[in-house]
UniProtKB/Swiss-Prot annotation:
Pathway: Amino-sugar metabolism; N-acetylneuraminate degradation; D-fructose 6-phosphate from N-acetylneuraminate: step 3/5
GO function terms (MF aspect): N-acylglucosamine-6-phosphate 2-epimerase activity
UniProt cross-references to InterPro entries, sorted A to Z: Aldolase_TIM, NanE, RibuloseP-bd_barrel
Pfam families (UniProt xref): NanE
Source species taxonomy: Bacteria, Bacillati, Mycoplasmatota, Mollicutes, Mycoplasmataceae
GO biological process, one term: N-acetylmannosamine catabolic process
Protein name stated in the entry: Putative N-acetylmannosamine-6-phosphate 2-epimerase
Family stated for the protein in its record: Belongs to the NanE family.
EC number: 5.1.3.9
Reactions catalysed: an N-acyl-D-glucosamine 6-phosphate = an N-acyl-D-mannosamine 6-phosphate
GN (gene name): nanE
Amino acid sequence: MNLIDQIKNTLIISCQAVDDEPLNDSYVLSKMCYALVLGGAKVLRLSQVEHIKKIKEVVNVPIIGLIKKHYDNSEVFITPTIKEVDQLVDLKVDIIALDATLRKRPDQDLTNLIKTIKTKYPNQLLMADCSNINDAINAQNLGFDLISTTLRGYTKDTLNHNNIENDYQFLKDLKKVITKPIIAEGGIWTPQQAKEILNLGIHSIVVGSAITRLHLIVKYWNDNLK
């Protein structure tokens, strides 16, 4: 069974920390990921070279890897250039996730970046982090292996929107036009939501904040106790 089939109907856990987040420490994240795998996590979504290296020392599950890197001339920061792709290939991550929005990139445009990746690394699986339908259609046409909704709510035109609103209407609309496997990421806080999304025919789901970002989990509880 290939990896894409293997992750169908799977709970993918995102365990990341950057900048001044309190858990931004490779040792801490490696222990968290070890605990996640003990709990049954089958696939992890991870960022940053030093973190991925350390985590790979203690777990042996498929990894969706990305590098968050900010450049002065672009809003794109998830694996924005071929340099970050090269680093992730060196780490031997199973799937590389990159921003697939139509926004201006710091180096090559998305079309040429994908051509470069497919020439250098023809067997590398790629996940498109999208924000809207147009991103997803373009990513599918460019040959991405997986289409993810990671960036919905994080771009100017999708601000204040998410994957859950209006009874998952965005995911339903996406399913009508995308034939590649769709990965739902963002805004999923309960197992019930996860089940309902998978029942739409979505390939698999990514949950991060609701499981691995302690400050947001506490905030969620406090907000719901009011």
